[in-house]
Regions:
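A basic, amphipathic helix-loop patch mediating RNA/tRNA/ribosome contacts
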Residues: 1-11
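Short linker/helix segments within small regulatory modules
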Residues: 11, 141-153
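Loop/turn positions that initiate beta-strands
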Residues: 15-20
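Extended interfacial segments that mediate partner engagement and assembly in macromolecular machines
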Residues: 25, 29-58, 166-184
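BRCT (BRCA1 C-terminal) domain core and associated BRCT-interaction motifs
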Residues: 63-75, 86-87
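Short metal-coordination and nucleic-acid-contact micro-motifs, chiefly zinc-binding Cys/His arrays
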Residues: 117-121, 150-153
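Short cysteine-rich clusters marking metal-coordination/redox-active sites
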Residues: 124-127, 157-160
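Short functional micro-motifs and their immediate structural scaffolds
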Residues: 129-133, 165
Length: 185
């Protein structure tokens, strides 16, 4: 928003005769540094999808609003929510309202708005830790017999130890990655 030819915040008080220009926020919306997000308790599915895509995404299903603001500020994360009241908190460093009720609509909104770099299959969907490739021998004691027989390629979270492989569920996940990649192009 411009008033009198200079950028002003929405709270700016106009003087008589001021001319106001309002421009849309550019897309993708510029952020300081690589996008890092913190999602509120109502966006758990979106959080898992962002992690699947390799986007640095913090999420806790039991964190109250003041704690979310503190974490977002301390870690310089964009707080994503559908709670407009949360976004109005003065102490919040940076936040964004996520549009849509379906997780696919929410994901598309976020990808089109912020265009984070996608690195699919590199983050743990449970804790956001970084995945690393591991040998079957390293994780064999953790696997059920059918999994050991059927799969040879594995990844493991360096933070929580969760083991990943391209199992029967991977078709659905690959479709999410395919759609997200198309939306980000």
């Amino acid at each position: 928003m411009l008033a009198g030819g200079r950028g002003v915040p929405p709270s700016h008080l106009l003087a008589p005769g001021d001319e106001v220009e309002v421009h849309p926020v550019p897309r993708p919306q510029p952020l300081p540094g690589e996008p890092r997000f913190l999602l509120d308790v109502h966006l758990g599915t979106l959080a898992r999808r962002l992690r699947l895509l390799g986007v640095d995404t913090a999420y806790h299903n039991d964190m109250d609003d003041p704690a979310l603001v503190v974490q977002a500020n301390e870690e310089r994360r964009v707080l994503l929510t559908q709670d407009r009241g949360l976004l109005r908190r003065r102490a919040l460093w940076l936040g964004a309202y996520i549009r849509g009720s379906a997780p696919s609509d929410q994901l598309r909104d976020l990808l089109e708005r912020f265009a984070p770099p996608l690195r699919p299959w590199t983050r743990c969907t449970a804790c956001n830790g970084v995945l690393r490739p591991v040998t079957k021998d390293e994780v064999e004691p953790l696997l059920e017999a059918g999994t050991r027989r059927s799969y040879d390629a594995y990844g493991r979270c360096g933070s929580c130890g969760q083991v990943y492989w391209h199992g029967a569920h991977s078709g659905h996940l690959e479709e999410i990655v395919r759609m997200a990649t198309a939306w980000s192009a």
